[in-house]
Amino acid sequence: MGPGLLCWALLCLLGAGLVDAGVTQSPTHLIKTRGQQVTLRCSPKSGHDTVSWYQQALGQGPQFIFQYYEEEERQRGNFPDRFSGHQFPNYSSELNVNALLLGDSALYLCASSL
């Protein structure tokens, strides 16, 4: 694998362990090169209307990216504008990262709540 490749592993924040959160993320893993764009999707647990996205770099704790509630961004962490999102009427959400950098290589997590 060349130095320009980014490995992206995606897991559910609560759905990956013993707790069944009902959150579904796709794709489950992804490899991209620097400069490309990526879109990650999250379907929340039935009845949940809030979706939060997190980035977890190797050896670090999860860092809050943003939260969507009823199709509007409610809160945003300290991430550049290259990180954007959207929530659809069915409450599913997308995380978009443009102009990928090597430092964007991380675990991306979504969580849903009421």
Swiss-Prot record:
<feature type="domain" description="Ig-like">
    <location>
        <begin position="22"/>
        <end position="114"/>
    </location>
</feature>
<keyword id="KW-0675">Receptor</keyword>
<keyword id="KW-1279">T cell receptor</keyword>
<keyword id="KW-0325">Glycoprotein</keyword>
<dbReference type="InterPro" id="IPR013106">
    <property type="entry name" value="Ig_V-set"/>
</dbReference>
<comment type="function">
    <text>V region of the variable domain of T cell receptor (TR) beta chain that participates in the antigen recognition. Alpha-beta T cell receptors are antigen specific receptors which are essential to the immune response and are present on the cell surface of T lymphocytes. Recognize peptide-major histocompatibility (MH) (pMH) complexes that are displayed by antigen presenting cells (APC), a prerequisite for efficient T cell adaptive immunity against pathogens.</text>
</comment>
<dbReference type="Pfam" id="PF07686">
    <property type="entry name" value="V-set"/>
</dbReference>
<feature type="glycosylation site" description="N-linked (GlcNAc...) asparagine">
    <location>
        <position position="90"/>
    </location>
</feature>
<keyword id="KW-0732">Signal</keyword>
<keyword id="KW-0393">Immunoglobulin domain</keyword>
<feature type="signal peptide">
    <location>
        <begin position="1"/>
        <end position="21"/>
    </location>
</feature>
<dbReference type="GO" id="GO:0002250">
    <property type="term" value="P:adaptive immune response"/>
</dbReference>
<comment type="subunit">
    <text>Alpha-beta TR is a heterodimer composed of an alpha and beta chain; disulfide-linked. The alpha-beta TR is associated with the transmembrane signaling CD3 coreceptor proteins to form the TR-CD3 (TcR or TCR). The assembly of alpha-beta TR heterodimers with CD3 occurs in the endoplasmic reticulum where a single alpha-beta TR heterodimer associates with one CD3D-CD3E heterodimer, one CD3G-CD3E heterodimer and one CD247 homodimer forming a stable octameric structure. CD3D-CD3E and CD3G-CD3E heterodimers preferentially associate with TR alpha and TR beta chains, respectively.</text>
</comment>
<keyword id="KW-1015">Disulfide bond</keyword>
<dbReference type="InterPro" id="IPR036179">
    <property type="entry name" value="Ig-like_dom_sf"/>
</dbReference>
<feature type="disulfide bond">
    <location>
        <begin position="42"/>
        <end position="110"/>
    </location>
</feature>
<keyword id="KW-1003">Cell membrane</keyword>
<dbReference type="InterPro" id="IPR007110">
    <property type="entry name" value="Ig-like_dom"/>
</dbReference>
<keyword id="KW-0391">Immunity</keyword>
<keyword id="KW-1064">Adaptive immunity</keyword>
<dbReference type="GO" id="GO:0042101">
    <property type="term" value="C:T cell receptor complex"/>
</dbReference>
<keyword id="KW-0472">Membrane</keyword>
<dbReference type="GO" id="GO:0005886">
    <property type="term" value="C:plasma membrane"/>
</dbReference>
<dbReference type="InterPro" id="IPR013783">
    <property type="entry name" value="Ig-like_fold"/>
</dbReference>
<dbReference type="InterPro" id="IPR050413">
    <property type="entry name" value="TCR_beta_variable"/>
</dbReference>
<dbReference type="GO" id="GO:0007166">
    <property type="term" value="P:cell surface receptor signaling pathway"/>
</dbReference>
<protein>
    <recommendedName>
        <fullName>T cell receptor beta variable 5-6</fullName>
    </recommendedName>
</protein>
